[in-house]
């Protein structure tokens, strides 16, 4: 799995609806993919049988279908978040004039853990795109650097501000606005017996972190991706 998926670390994958590329990867545990979906185009209606998936819309507006029925669709404007359980079919459509940009969080990383149920471009039941649909990432593409304690990173993507930070405790995290979105890139929030409450790939807001901080603790260091307007 790692050998096959790591091929995409330095590639842009060309899609009929736009493109995507790996903007960050933590070993084989977590992959963050940048998606650009053009206006009035959508991804296949697909699911991931083995991995947990989360999205943060960082620019534009998306229409996201959950499940097999179109009626189960909602609009998400930037910045907004969504967690998708293992095996749930979903599709994302760009409805803004300039399309939609999103970050996809996959746990664990496996590009080939993909089942396409329906597709506008004839890819139904077909696997993930191979090397014939990829090209080398250009220097103008944003790539997140390795997170280091005391060296926060900042990126402006569309109308969203993206920070990557490393925290030893909750002190600075819980002082953020309640609308702030956090994605966990590394580390864990655990209970008194060391059991995971929140781990890499989870996406939550400040309000949830405030409540969790009253009972649980950060194990070692927590690496977060923070998004706000």
Task: Pin down the residues of each PLM region.
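Residue-level recognition of conserved beta-strand positions in structured domain cores
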Residues: 34, 47, 66-68, 94, ...
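A generic "binding-loop/recognition-motif" signal
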Residues: 41, 50, 88-89, 98, ...
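Double-stranded beta-helix
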Residues: 2, 6-9, 14-15, 95-145, ...
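Catalytic cores of nucleotide-enabled group-transfer and carboxylate-activating enzymes in metabolic
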Residues: 17-18, 38-41, 46-53, 59-62, ...
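Asparagine-centered strand-capping/turn motif at beta-strand->loop junctions
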Residues: 91-96, 175, 184, 212-218
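Short acidic-glycine-tyrosine-enriched beta hairpin
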Residues: 66-90, 190-213
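Short, conserved beta-strand element in jelly-roll/cupin
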Residues: 36-37, 47-64, 68, 175-191
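A short glycine-rich, His/Asp/Glu-containing loop-to-beta-strand
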Residues: 10-51, 137-179
């Amino acid at each position: 799995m790692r050998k096959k998926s790591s091929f995409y670390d330095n590639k842009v994958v060309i899609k009929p609806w736009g493109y995507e590329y790996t903007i960050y990867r933590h070993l084989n545990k977590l992959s963050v993919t940048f998606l650009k979906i053009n206006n009035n185009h959508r991804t296949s209606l697909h699911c991931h049988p083995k991995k947990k998936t989360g999205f943060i819309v960082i620019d534009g507006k998306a229409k996201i279908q959950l499940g097999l029925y179109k009626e189960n669709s909602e609009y998400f404007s930037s910045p907004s978040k969504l967690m998708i359980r293992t095996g749930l079919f979903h599709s994302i459509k760009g409805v803004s004039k300039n399309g939609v940009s999103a970050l996809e969080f996959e746990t664990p990383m496996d590009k080939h853990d993909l089942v396409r149920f329906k597709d506008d471009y004839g890819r139904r039941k077909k696997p993930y795109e191979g090397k014939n649909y990829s090209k080398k990432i250009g220097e103008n593409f944003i790539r997140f650097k390795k997170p280091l304690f005391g060296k926060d990173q900042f990126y402006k993507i569309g109308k969203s501000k993206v920070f990557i930070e490393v925290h030893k405790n909750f002190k600075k995290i819980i002082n953020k606005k309640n609308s702030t979105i956090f994605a966990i890139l590394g580390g864990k929030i655990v209970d008194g017996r060391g059991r995971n409450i929140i781990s890499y790939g989870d996406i939550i807001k400040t309000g949830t972190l405030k409540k969790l901080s009253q009972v649980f603790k950060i194990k070692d260091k927590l690496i977060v991706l923070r998004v706000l307007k």
